[in-house]
Amino acid sequence: MIAIETRQLAGGVVLHAFPEGKRAVPLPCVVFYHGFTSSSLVYSYFAVALAQAGFRVVMPDAPEHGARFGGDSQGRIHRFWQILHQNMQEFTTLRAAIQAENWLLDGRLAVGGASMGGMTALGIMTRHREVKCGA
């Protein structure tokens, strides 16, 4: 069994999934990023599968996506690269918030994603040598 919730973290709303009963227990953690024009809620099946495997999962919405979507679909298309770059920049704050919550077991933090989220994960790995695993 797992638990899944939306909550405030690092100044924004994230989807947070974890094995049931382990909300406050340090676990290996995956920050998972969704694709362009999508949201963490649409990609929540990744959170379910990873939490069932024993991971803590944190899924933020990219700028102008999900809970952060302001309604400008046409403009968003023209801001793809800015959105991708901001997504990568926000990782530092998100990682610090995850550490402050004492959610990491032995510093085991991975990043992953699909589509634009995969590009985000790869970009984070090139800039954050402390991240040892990506998917």
Annotate each predicted stretch with a short phrase.
Residues 25-35:
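Short beta-strand element of the alpha/beta-hydrolase
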Residues 94-135:
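Primarily recognizes the serine-hydrolase "nucleophile elbow" in alpha/beta-hydrolase
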Residues 48, 52, 126-129:
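Short, well-ordered alpha-helices that flank and scaffold nucleotide-derived cofactor binding pockets
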Residues 50-71:
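Conserved alpha/beta-hydrolase
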